[in-house]
């Protein structure tokens, strides 16, 4: 299994139409910071969930992306689910989003990082599969969940908009949140 701790350059928002990505933001695009500070330490249960992950992800245009395991912790403290996420931490990576992927394994995802909490809108432009789009605030608390279907046969997905407020946007395969009993108020736990 390929697990790397993320050393991310965090960049602010980019007001543009993005595929499976942000289209509007209140964040500033000028500042970048390098950090290795974790949002939270993994518990033994979370570490066990991460150790079981072995997806063939990321691949293709995402193969060079940094990755981080992301665990969702329920309000009761229990682990809801875990995936290995490719990290989209630059304007170009956030713009591309998952639109170049034909599929993604159930144990894979993408974590979009921003320097601060902001209002953002993600779209399904050029997506080949449906997503759950999860917004989380600065401490990883989930604020919004959207279950976004793939665009129709004659659609490009640009009109499928999913707004939310957060510092992190986490995308997983559609219905992953339902299958794992994830809800608003649960928390994303990862190292960044």
Model regions and ranges:
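Hydrophobic alpha-helical segments
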Residues: 1-192
